[in-house]
C-alpha cells in the first residue's frame, strides 16, 4: 500500500527537524562540552522549540548518546569500509588507521565526542563508546588473527589485546594532536602505521 504524499512530507519535515537538532547538539557538545551545554543551547542553535527536542529525545543524555551513536557510527563505518579495500592485512590495517586519523581531523566535532566528551560520562554513554571502539578493535584483531601464521611481526601478538592497543593509541594520539596542533593527519597516520602495521 502506498504511503500518502502528505505523510511522506510530514516524515521528511520531522527528519529535517531531527537532523537540525542532531547537528546543533554535535556542535554544542563539541565546542562547550556535555556538562556546560544545556537543552536550551541545543534548541536555540537548531532553531526549534523545546517540545520539538523532546519529540525525539528523552533527555540531554539521550540526545548525546544518539549523536554519538549516529555520528561516531558513521565515522567508524567509513574507517571499516576503506580498510576493507586493502589487498592484504598490512594494507587493511594501514588504510583503517589512516582513515580514522583523517576522519577525526576532518570531523573534529565527532572526534571530540568520541574521544573526549564521552569518556566516563555515564553507563549509557560508555556503552555506546565501547560499542563503537569495539567495531574498530575487532576489525584490527581479525586482521592480526589472520596474519599470525604468515607474518612474523604479528605471530606473537594477542589479537584482542593488539586490537584494543591500536584503538587506544590511535585515539589518544588523535585527541592529543587535535588539541595541540603541530602535526597533520597524514604525518600522524604514517607514524602510527609504522608502529602498528610496519
Across the structure, where does each feature detected by a protein language model lie?
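Helix-turn-helix
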Residues: 20, 28-62, 66
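Generic hydrophobic, amphipathic alpha-helix propensity
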Residues: 13-25, 42, 67-75, 79, ...
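Short hydrophobic clusters on alpha-helical segments that form packing/core surfaces
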Residues: 17, 21-29, 100, 170
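N-terminal intrinsically disordered/low-complexity leader segments
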Residues: 1-16
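Amphipathic alpha-helical packing segments from all-alpha helical-bundle domains
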Residues: 73-77, 123-150, 160-167, 171, ...
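Short secondary-structure transition hinges
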Residues: 95, 102-141, 152-153, 160, ...
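Hydrophobic alpha-helical connector segments
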Residues: 66, 80-109, 162-166, 186-189
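Amphipathic C-terminal alpha-helical segment
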Residues: 102-106, 110, 142, 146, ...
Amino acid at each position: 500500500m502506498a504511503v500518502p504524499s502528505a505523510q511522506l512530507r510530514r516524515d521528511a519535515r520531522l527528519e529535517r527537524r531531527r537532523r537540525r537538532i542532531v547537528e546543533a547538539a554535535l556542535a554544542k557538545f563539541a565546542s562547550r562540552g556535555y556538562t556546560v551545554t544545556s537543552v536550551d543551547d541545543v534548541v536555540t542553535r537548531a532553531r526549534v522549540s523545546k517540545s520539538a527536542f523532546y519529540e525525539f529525545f528523552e533527555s540531554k543524555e539521550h540526545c548525546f548518546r544518539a549523536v554519538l551513536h549516529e555520528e561516531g557510527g558513521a565515522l567508524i563505518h567509513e574507517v571499516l569500509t576503506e580498510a576493507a579495500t586493502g589487498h592484504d592485512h598490512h594494507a587493511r590495517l594501514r588504510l583503517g588507521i589512516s582513515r580514522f586519523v583523517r576522519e577525526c581531523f576532518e570531523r573534529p566535532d565527532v572526534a571530540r565526542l568520541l574521544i573526549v566528551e564521552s569518556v566516563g560520562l555515564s553507563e549509557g554513554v560508555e556503552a555506546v563508546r565501547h560499542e563503537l571502539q569495539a567495531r574498530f578493535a575487532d576489525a584490527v584483531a581479525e586482521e592480526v588473527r589472520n596474519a599470525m601464521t604468515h607474518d612474523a611481526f604479528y605471530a606473537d601478538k594477542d589479537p584482542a589485546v593488539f586490537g584494543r592497543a591500536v584503538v587506544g593509541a590511535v585515539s589518544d594520539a588523535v585527541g592529543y594532536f587535535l588539541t595541540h596542533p603541530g602535526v597533520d593527519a597524514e604525518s600522524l597516520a604514517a607514524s602510527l602505521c609504522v608502529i602498528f602495521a610496519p
